[in-house]
Amino acid sequence: MICGSKKKAYLKSQNLKILGQGKLNGIVKINGAKNSALVLLASSLLTNEKIILENIPYLTDIEKMGNILKNLGVNLIDKNDQLEIDPTNISIKELPYELVNGLRASFFCIGALLTKFGEAQVPLPGGCNIGSRPIDEHINGLIALGADIIIEEGIVKAKIRGNKNKLHGTHIKLKCPSVGATETLIMAASLAEGRTTIENAAREPEIQDLCHMLNKMGAKIYDSGKETIIIDGVNKLGGCTHKVIPDRIEAGTFLIAAAATSSSITISPVIPHHLEAVTNKLQESGSKITIKGNSISIKSKEIKGVDIETAPFPGFPTDLQAPFTALMTIANGESKITETIFENRMNHIHLLNKMGARIKLNENVAYIKGVKTLNGMDLIGSDLRSSAALIIAGIIAEGTSNIYGLEHLDRGYENFELKLKKLGIKITREFNKSTFEENEFKIEPKSEDISNLRAA
């Protein structure tokens, strides 16, 4: 729904109240991937024709990106689980700080705006406080493509160099396989003049989804999902209809929750090979995994400790490190969790220890000795994935837990507690109302339950 004028709404301080030691049973519907949907929304800026995105998740991050596009002049219509995007009336090439603050994915817009209009101004990105995520690779790549870039007072100002009206193809070798840089440079190169080669590119499924959609729009992108991606620039891109891939992180979170509670569930739809690193570790820890078509079933009893080390795809995803750490707290034996992607992604460790876990942290490595159970507590999640980990810990624990900081959780999990409740977990969202004024794009709720959650 597009809100055309200011209206009164409610900003709610919320918590999840969890009665622990429950079990999960049933089927979980997995939503569209947040990390894919965000970059697909940004890529709609590359065309003057309508884009229809299917399987868009209902998340606060998606709303933020919708508001950014609306501010640029894009018309958005949400209907029947589809989002229609009409970018024909884009009139602004600058993103305001108040809209992009807290949404790192907003920076993806710079590549699309620069290559389409010849210039762009985008504030430095925000997002979860999980450590330094520099944009050097984005900037260096855009400069190599022919942009002049300066950063003034937190604003990245980019303009095509000289009197040219197009970026030019080039060879770019990334120092590390950055997902954001790969996506930004793919979008920028899609309308550049000539061929661009991106070496040491990220291989994540969300990048493959972006390339698939851009090719539907008329782009010429080859070898997405490989370490070297080739883009032959085209003069213009058209419209298309595209279905967002399933969210592998949401899927993995539910599989881990089932393993942690000795439960049996089925998740669908998923793309099983996107989850191979996760299902392999769950099998190693004692769970039985069955794959049939686009569904994965898990049966879990006793869990034993296993070691994981996060890595770029196809390795173990950093976004599931915190939930898997929660699982290992009650595993038999010892385990070691090594975080290699972000230097500040262990914020959940001291909170799990408060619940009775036995974890020693040495910089980016957590050494865990499994305990029989955890104890319910009131805790505040500090970022998206640590919040999910605390909810899993609350389900494991004896007694009642109240998990706060749901503004982080709602950035990445659609209707999380209602799905858990449907699976048999005793969990309730509690509200504390206060009013504010808003004028924002909102994706319509997909069920009566979500409507009730948002009702004033």
Curated annotation (Swiss-Prot):
Localization of this protein: Cytoplasm
Enzymatic reactions: phosphoenolpyruvate + UDP-N-acetyl-alpha-D-glucosamine = UDP-N-acetyl-3-O-(1-carboxyvinyl)-alpha-D-glucosamine + phosphate
Binding sites annotated in the UniProt record for UDP-N-acetyl-alpha-D-glucosamine: 104, 319, 341
Enzyme Commission number: 2.5.1.7
Key words of the record: Cell cycle, Cell division, Cell shape, Cell wall biogenesis/degradation, Cytoplasm, Peptidoglycan synthesis, Pyruvate, Transferase
Pfam family, one: EPSP_synthase
GO molecular function: UDP-N-acetylglucosamine 1-carboxyvinyltransferase activity
Top-level lineage group: Bacteria
Record PTM 2-(S-cysteinyl)pyruvic acid O-phosphothioketal, positions in chain: 128
Bilayer-crossing regions: none
GO CC annotation terms, alphabetical: cytoplasm
Residues forming the catalytic site: 128
Gene Ontology terms: biological process: cell division; cell wall organization; peptidoglycan biosynthetic process; regulation of cell shape; UDP-N-acetylgalactosamine biosynthetic process
Function, as annotated: Cell wall formation. Adds enolpyruvyl to UDP-N-acetylglucosamine.
Alphabetized PANTHER family for the sequence: UDP-N-ACETYLGLUCOSAMINE 1-CARBOXYVINYLTRANSFERASE
NCBIfam families associated with the record: murA (TIGR01072), PRK09369.1 (NF006873)
Record-stated family: Belongs to the EPSP synthase family. MurA subfamily.
Protein name: UDP-N-acetylglucosamine 1-carboxyvinyltransferase
